């Protein structure tokens, strides 16, 4: 599904977020393959955060004391002019990415953006590209969209050890009871397995077996996602059509129309996101907090609202 080699994949437990946390934690306490010292012994550590983005990503790096640097998102992915300038600083240790159907904008990184990311030459020898491919097969409008393999792209530019890719079946089988994985170079795999071998004996092999028997292969898994799409598309259509009918004529907000992923990203007139969500709560609708999609939970424009339509029935959404 990721397009990489079997030897580059480590299958874990139910949560890719745990694998992401562990990767940053190991870099902090032990360093990575090319670290001169553990990150905890660096005088200053900074992290690039394409924004709006995933609040749990930001919380991980915030919890380890990183200075979080906001990178504006464009229609093609993070603003790479800004990224390429910032990575000249050796204290910049990594960058979060949700490259396909980004959380929350639903943006797919362009081939050019992926090329520029894969060919980066950071000043930090242990710069860590965290590639959270959470929605790699999560189209709900149209067919599966093939996506470049970031591992081979990085290898092409001499950066094989720069990237760790993550994915899970949380939105394929059962959230909280699926399986997750990370993918990386063989050299990184050898290094990480030595550390993981001290931490754990194994993950839930029976659950891994259940998933192999149920998902079977790529073709069968994509067919399953088509069934998910039948459930999800009417919900997203309901949200977008309501916004277009009720809000568009007023000219007080803009939004993205994603073809996959799990969110609709709405931008209100600046200064109104918190007030809008307060009114929603008074009406009995609780949504993701305003500012959650920004580092430190602070949206300087107080504008972005993340709408997640997947849970309620269409009738409730309406």
Spans of features found by a protein language model:
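Conserved core of the PLP fold type I
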Residues: 1-125, 136-157
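Conserved core segment of the aminotransferase class I/II
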Residues: 12, 152-233
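Glycine-centered flexible beta-alpha turn that most often forms the glycine-rich phosphate-binding loop
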Residues: 132
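PLP-dependent enzyme catalytic core of the Aspartate aminotransferase-like
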Residues: 32-35, 159, 282, 296-318
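Hydrophobic "anchor" residues on beta-strands that sit immediately upstream
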Residues: 94, 128-129, 164
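Conserved glycine-rich beta-strand-loop-beta hairpin in the small C-terminal domain of fold type I
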Residues: 226-240, 252-267
